[in-house]
């Protein structure tokens, strides 16, 4: 099955023909998820590798292997995964769109990658015939060809075996769950597993997301909330348009293209207009959770293939459920999406004044808009196609300005590990732009609305305090190190103490002077959107 393969298969919008879907194949197959955990040699990474080996060995023993066999099997899997990892792209390399796009005919795939029996792979996965495919990362796929040729059949079976067991630990008995949790403890420092009811809710929400979303919306998301959010989004759009007009580093030609893209944003708020149809999904009470989840997984795979392979992109589809406390920008549809659940404190409070709400949800809206113009989004046009709309000079200006952010975040250290400024660049551009755009929108509001001092803070100060409150949190050092290895967002603390020193209006609001701890000279601040 698909979960046992050493690479990933999917279907998504063709980056250069965004109206249509394209079958994709790319790197995958790593139990620890990312390359760094196999190739780095710092203390924490070594601990994680040791815990992962212990985890696999224990799972092999639990399904009937004696200790010596379990040890041998674990070593075989580790050898295969280490080979895949060494050939895989790093988190930074995965951000380079051109290097991760290699479109070819299906026949070319068969010729270029003869070490994999593609006909059987796609047949077994339930795909109809298709003409074109995109290979995301050629090198790891070539490495898989070599592994398949050079590895004994027994070891290949062992690899598939651990993928099946490992993929099922969350839906088997508690002893399997406990083994999986031991690995989580080392990876993220978490000391206590979530209670079963929370895990059950997550499982159902993951499977029947929009069915739960419909109930959530009926209960918690009145039409008035949708209207309020739409007004906020329009105000932020106006503010970004003003800031584009005022940018001194862009030519008129590029500004016109940027504004055209901004005006063509598709805006999704609250919940989808058309709910997912789950009527074909069978849940059988006489079966175990494991069997039901296997059937459900098969249903969703078949459903996605039927709706997407050889079909145009469905622009009404949502990438998140209404009950998800998050938001996103999708470059291939040029859409910004704000699920119903983000419209609650600390992001949005109907009883709070505009200063707080613009610093909270306003910053988030501005953040998502800025993704349309970040290191990746800026490469896509208003129709969602990857296509350059910048003059060469403006592109250079943009890159020199974003480099300031890369260098600034590279210097930030948390839990003994440095933030990766290149990996987090897109999100840091999002925060930088989001703060500037939301602040500008608040200034527009204050031209007609009197917002006085509250609790001893000016409206401008409350705006930044609201942003800081959104990201307030407490994380164990192991979890911070984990995030800095896998997450394209900077850790929460850096999203405040790293982001604010780049924003001119913050200095004025709090009268920050040279000599203050977070002070950065004006010529070292990133002025982008």
List the predicted regions and their residue ranges:
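Noncatalytic, helix-rich "gating/capping" subdomain that lines the substrate-entry/channel surface
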Residues: 1-231, 235
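Intrinsically disordered, low-complexity linker/terminal regions across diverse proteins
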Residues: 112-115, 134-138, 194, 198-201, ...
């Amino acid at each position: 099955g698909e979960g046992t393969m050493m690479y990933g298969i999917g279907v998504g919008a063709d980056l250069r023909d965004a109206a249509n879907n394209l079958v994709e194949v790319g790197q995958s197959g790593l139990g620890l998820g990312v390359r760094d955990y196999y190739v780095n040699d710092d203390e924490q990474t070594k601990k994680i590798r040791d815990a992962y080996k212990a985890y696999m060995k224990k799972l092999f023993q639990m399904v009937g292997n004696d200790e010596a066999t379990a040890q041998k099997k674990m070593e075989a899997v580790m050898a295969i995964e280490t080979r895949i990892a060494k050939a895989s792209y790093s988190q930074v390399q995965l951000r380079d769109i051109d290097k991760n796009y290699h479109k070819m005919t299906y026949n070319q795939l068969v010729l270029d990658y003869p070490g994999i029996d593609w006909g059987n792979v796609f047949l077994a996965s339930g795909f109809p015939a298709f003409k074109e495919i995109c290979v995301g990362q050629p090198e790891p796929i070539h490495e898989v060809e070599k592994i398949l040729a050079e590895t004994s059949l027994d070891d290949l079976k062992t690899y598939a075996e651990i993928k099946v067991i490992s993929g099922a630990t969350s839906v088997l008995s508690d002893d399997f769950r406990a083994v999986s949790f031991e690995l989580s403890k080392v990876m993220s420092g978490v000391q206590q597993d979530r209670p079963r009811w929370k895990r059950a809710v997550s499982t159902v929400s993951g499977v029947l997301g929009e069915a739960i979303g419909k109930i959530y919306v009926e209960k918690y998301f009145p039409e008035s909330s949708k209207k309020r959010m739409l007004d906020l989004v329009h105000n932020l759009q106006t503010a970004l348009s003003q800031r584009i007009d005022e940018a001194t580093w862009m030519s008129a030609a590029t500004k016109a293209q940027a504004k055209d893209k901004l005006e063509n944003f598709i805006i999704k708020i609250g919940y989808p207009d058309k709910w997912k149809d789950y009527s074909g999904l069978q849940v059988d009470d006489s079966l175990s959770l494991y069997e039901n989840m296997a059937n459900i997984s098969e249903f969703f795979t078949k459903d996605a293939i039927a709706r997407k392979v050889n079909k145009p992109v469905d622009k009404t589809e949502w990438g998140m459920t209404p009950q998800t406390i998050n938001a996103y920008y999708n470059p291939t549809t040029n859409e910004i999406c704000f699920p119903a659940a983000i419209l609650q404190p600390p992001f949005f409070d109907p009883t709070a004044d505009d200063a707080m709400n613009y610093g909270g949800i306003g910053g988030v809206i501005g953040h998502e808009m800025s993704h349309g113009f970040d290191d990746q989004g800026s490469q896509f046009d208003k129709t969602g196609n990857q296509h350059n709309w910048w003059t060469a000079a403006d592109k250079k200006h943009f890159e020199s300005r974003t480099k300031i952010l890369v260098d600034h975040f590279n210097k930030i250290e948390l839990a003994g590990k440095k933030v990766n400024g290149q990996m987090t660049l897109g999100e840091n551009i999002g925060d930088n732009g989001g703060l500037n755009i939301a602040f500008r929108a608040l200034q527009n509001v204050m031209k007609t609305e009197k917002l006085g001092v509250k609790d001893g803070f000016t409206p401008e100060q409350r705006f930044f305090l609201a942003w800081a409150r959104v990201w307030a949190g407490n994380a164990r050092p192991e979890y911070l190190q984990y995030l800095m290895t896998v997450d394209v967002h900077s850790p929460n603390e850096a999203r405040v103490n790293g982001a604010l020193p780049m924003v001119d209006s913050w200095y004025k609001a709090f009268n920050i002077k040279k000599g203050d701890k977070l002070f950065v000279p004006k010529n070292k601040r990133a002025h982008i959107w």
